[in-house]
Structures are given as structure tokens and as C-alpha cells.
């Protein structure tokens, strides 16, 4: 028996997690002949999932030794170390998507190369703005290593290429009125020539801020993750590019690795399986419409 425990697909989670869930479901649909019972569990609050119903149900199953495998995200403390230790002692196979948490000792993780994403964002921006232009960077939560690694890649690219542009950092990680005001205040600075975000919710606030301050289409802007609002902003020339982290492939390959291990005894060849990230332009945005991404991103 396998459990999938991920953030749900509504509210603030709707910008990133639906393709991840879809990847899981597509693989399982194509593997119905395998002897796998998979149950979905979700939680609404990505910041503090510990007390959500979905997490509590999975914790109970683990405590009662009723699970053989678990697919979950790697960047959150959904369970205590004692509970993870019990799962390891019971032989539960854990695959993480999005980030590898070595404290949990997962079978493997499936994730993008976040530092490469940061370098890609930096290269896009610094090939389009003058050396004196400043950049607003929505850097997300510095305690989440996937956000921090994108920022690190961005800064490494700057250092290696001699870019001395000023960077205005915003560490908001959720859409909110205060976060929106902070981002707007940064965008209104007269020296800002570009902006980008390491996370989907930051992209939403960047787009709103650019529209509010009258700089939409005048500041080079790079968004994060493919969802309808970002695609609309790309088509409307508010965003110039989108860098997507391929959550569909993360979900598909994550559940595939878990099922193959449990059913066939096939261990993953690598502890960390990297999925490719891609740059979306207006010219290729159509490839991400209407589920075209399913074949494109595997």
C-alpha cells in the first residue's frame, strides 16, 4: 500500500501543485495492472502542515505499519524525527519530490537543479538590461533550501560574470497585502530595470505590482512556474519569460521510482533524480496549454 502526501491543488497551492498531482495520477493510470493500492492525502497549509488532517492520517498509517511506501515533498517537517525513524525501521520506502531532506533518508528524491534555475534567470536578465540597472528579486523563504539555492545560483552567475547591478531582495513567500505592498515599493524605485521571482506566488505579486506602478512591459520580467495567470501575463507582455520547474515530471518520475522499487525491487540508479527545467517564451507558450506539457516534459 502506497500513500501520496502533497499540498492540495486549491487556494495558493493551485499555482504549482496541480501538474505534480497530474504526473502522479497519469503514471498510476498507465500502471493499473500493477498490484499497487495508492491513496491520496493532501494538506492546505504549505507553511505548517503538521496538524492538518491529511498529515495526521498518514502519521496514523505509519504508526500502525499499514504503509509500504510514501511519496511526499521534501522541504517540510510534516512528521517528527521519531516518526520518520519508525518508518525507516519498518522498511517504509520514502520518495521525496521537490527537494531532498537527508535527515529523512529517502529512497530517492526527484527535483530540478535549483542553482541552474537561478543561473538561468540571471543570464536572461543580465543579457537584457544595462550594467547600472537594478533588479527586484522575489527570493522566497530563505529557510527553504530550494528557494535559497535559486538565489545562490543567481548570485553565483553575477559574481562569475562581473555583474555589479544592485539587487533588491524581497523574502515574501505567500501572497498577502503586506507582501504586495513591499514588492510594489521596490518596483517603484526609479533604477529598477528588471525583476524576477523564484516562486509562483512571488510571480503573481510581481505581475500585479508591475501593473499597479505602470511599469508593465517596461521592465524586463521573469516569472516562475507555468500556470494560467503567468501564461496570461506572458502573452500580455508583462512577463518576458517564465522558468518552470517541471512539477509534472517530478510527480510522474517520483511515483514511478517508488512503485518500481516496491513491485519490481528496482532501486533508483541515483539518490537524486534531476528533472529538466525550461524557459518559456511567448513563441513556445502554446506548448504548455491544454495538457500539451504531459508529453513535452518527460
Where are these regions (language model features)?
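Hinge/beta->alpha junction and helix N-cap segments in small-molecule ligand-binding domains
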Residues: 7-19, 39-55, 75-76, 110-120, ...
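Signal peptide-proximal N-terminal region
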Residues: 25-39
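Anion (oxyanion) recognition and catalysis
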Residues: 29, 86-89, 159
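Hydrophobic alpha-helical
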Residues: 55-89, 153-154, 166-233
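Proline-centered loop/turn at the N-terminus of a beta-strand
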Residues: 69, 91-95, 108, 134, ...
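Flexible loop/hinge segments that line or gate small-molecule binding clefts
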Residues: 75-116, 227-240
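Hinge/cleft segment of the Venus flytrap/periplasmic-binding protein
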Residues: 142, 158-161, 246-298
Amino acid at each position: 500500500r502506497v500513500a501520496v502526501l502533497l499540498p492540495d491543488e486549491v487556494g495558493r497551492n493551485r499555482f504549482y501543485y496541480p501538474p505534480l498531482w497530474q504526473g502522479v495520477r497519469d503514471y498510476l493510470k498507465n500502471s493499473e495492472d500493477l498490484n499497487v493500492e495508492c491513496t491520496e492525502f493532501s494538506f492546505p497549509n504549505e507553511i505548517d502542515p503538521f496538524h492538518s488532517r491529511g498529515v495526521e492520517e498518514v502519521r496514523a498509517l505509519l504508526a500502525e505499519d499499514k504503509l509500504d511506501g510514501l511519496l511526499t515533498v521534501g522541504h517540510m517537517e510534516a512528521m517528527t524525527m521519531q516518526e520518520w525513524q519508525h518508518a525507516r525501521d519498518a522498511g517504509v520506502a520514502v520518495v521525496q519530490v521537490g527537494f531532498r531532506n537527508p535527515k529523512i533518508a529517502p529512497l530517492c528524491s526527484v527535483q530540478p537543479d535549483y542553482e541552474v534555475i537561478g543561473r538561468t534567470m540571471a543570464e536572461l536578465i543580465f543579457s537584457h538590461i544595462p550594467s547600472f540597472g537594478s533588479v527586484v528579486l522575489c527570493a522566497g523563504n530563505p529557510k527553504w533550501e530550494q528557494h535559497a539555492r535559486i538565489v545562490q545560483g543567481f548570485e553565483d552567475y553575477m559574481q562569475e560574470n562581473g555583474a555589479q547591478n544592485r539587487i533588491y531582495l524581497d523574502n515574501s513567500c505567500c501572497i498577502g497585502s503586506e507582501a504586495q505592498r513591499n514588492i510594489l515599493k521596490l518596483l517603484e524605485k526609479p533604477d529598477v530595470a528588471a525583476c524576477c521571482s523564484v516562486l509562483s506566488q512571488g510571480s503573481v505579486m510581481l505581475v500585479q505590482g508591475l501593473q499597479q506602478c505602470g511599469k508593465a512591459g517596461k521592465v524586463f520580467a521573469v516569472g516562475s512556474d507555468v500556470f494560467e495567470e503567468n501564461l496570461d501575463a506572458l502573452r500580455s507582455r508583462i512577463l518576458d519569460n517564465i522558468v518552470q520547474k517541471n512539477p509534472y515530471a517530478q510527480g510522474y518520475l517520483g511515483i514511478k521510482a517508488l512503485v518500481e522499487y516496491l513491485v519490481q525491487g528496482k532501486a533508483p540508479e541515483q539518490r537524486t533524480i534531476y528533472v529538466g527545467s525550461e524557459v518559456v517564451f511567448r513563441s513556445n507558450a502554446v506548448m504548455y496549454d491544454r495538457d500539451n506539457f504531459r508529453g513535452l516534459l518527460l
